[in-house]
Amino acid sequence: MTNISKNAVTKPDWLRVKAPQVERIGNTANLLSDLKLNTVCQEASCPNIGECFASGTATFLIMGPGCTRACPYCDIDFDRSKRDLDPTEPDRLAEAVFRLKLKHVVITSVNRDDLDDGGASQFYKCVSEVRKKSPETTIELLIPDLCGNWSALEKILDSRPNVLNHNIETVSALYRKVRPQGNYQRTLELLKRTREYFPSVYTKSGFMLGLGEKDDEVLTLLMDLRKNDVDIVTIGQYLSPGPKHLQVQRFVTPSKFNYFKLFGENELGFMQVVSSPLTRSSYHAEEIQKLMKKFPR
């Protein structure tokens, strides 16, 4: 297995982000605060929060903000206590989508291993409420692995999202270090089962570079995703949230990111590979509407 050391490396210039437009960030943040909604943009310290909030978009984080898993790369708070789901959350989320006039919305969640269905029913309710208030809005769900509960997966898919995203996060060799409660093969199976159960959905997955992976392992990962019917892939640079988290092993150059993009699209036939240092799984997710027109189902 590839070793992951604790030594940090210097951040390069290409990871610098332009200063955000404070006023427009404030408008989006205030709306989310008024409706008592969480976003992964805030909870996971996403580097693109300025750009996304300034454009009036956000990735909603439901059933949180605490997560029942403590992955060493993630900045979301760990909370293993049993918590009741908020029955008003789906309606509040739908209201935010309506007021922000979103053409495309991304809904994700923390892991809720304390729930029998992993939160599948809450995903279903959120999609249903958004459809009622914003019927023209396309919906992308970024879901956890549900501990391999395939009936829960089917419950989520019964809500008929346009896109089902589940991130594989890293190469197989690093899984036990990076996602100790996850499973590489289970993630691939979830993605494959998604297309088998709901053939018209667009499937998506993403992963990070800079954790100690080798280039040939990245190519294998891309091939594994394609073999399991994934349509869209996102690849971004891992940035350590703090000293207690896994540290960056390398900063991958923009040209290397582009190499993986070209390999995925030209050699493997993905619909789209979004690959750059600042790419995150929901970054520019609204562009899925263009893909849906280009590759109709």
Swiss-Prot record:
List of residues binding [4Fe-4S] cluster 2: 67, 71, 74
Positions contributing to [4Fe-4S] cluster 1 binding: 41, 46, 52, 282
Keyword Plastid on entry: no
Root EC class: transferase
Cellular compartment(s): Cytoplasm
Source organism, top-level taxon: Bacteria
Known EC number: 2.8.1.8
Pathway(s) this gene product operates in, as recorded in its UniProt entry: Protein modification; protein lipoylation via endogenous pathway; protein N(6)-(lipoyl)lysine from octanoyl-[acyl-carrier-protein]: step 2/2
Residue ranges of domain Radical SAM core in the record: 53-271
GO annotations of cellular component type: cytoplasm
Cofactor note as given: Binds 2 [4Fe-4S] clusters per subunit. One cluster is coordinated with 3 cysteines and an exchangeable S-adenosyl-L-methionine.
Assigned protein family: Belongs to the radical SAM superfamily. Lipoyl synthase family.
Protein name: Lipoyl synthase 1
Source species of the chain: Prochlorococcus marinus subsp. pastoris (strain CCMP1986 / NIES-2087 / MED4)
